């Protein structure tokens, strides 16, 4: 059973450590780290180190939406396709995991796909609500062309 590497060592990474369980997390990964850093006793590894060991672990991206998208692009660019956006699983612990152990749940390819799908679905719904708000509160006939200033 693969343990978890949390990509992101900030506030959301610390929250993910608590939610996913310290016993299930091997370490953190951060693009901006020094090799001696630890958080809650967990080492913080560099992205370069992650590239060497990623096949042995589950990567959970524990960052805000903008940074999650940047890290997804970074991982995909380096050929890493198996990752789980934390924003795609947070809040589902009791509803989805149920009696299953978190590692058992997250090690399933089907559940990893569910987390990715859920992340993009929530992102879409958020953008849709912003567009709906804009449509309800603006008059397109009063918009002027951009001047570049």
Task: Please name every model-derived segment.
Residues 2-20:
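Glycine-rich adenosine-cofactor-binding loop
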Residues 23-27:
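A generic structural motif
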Residues 10, 29-35:
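Short, polar loop motifs at secondary-structure junctions
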Residues 6-7, 29, 60-62:
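Short hydrophobic segments within beta-strands
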Residues 33-131:
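Phosphate-bearing ligand-interacting subdomains
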Residues 132-133, 141-143:
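Extended, small-residue-rich solenoid/repeat segments and analogous flexible loops
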Residues 32, 142-149:
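Conserved SAM-binding loop
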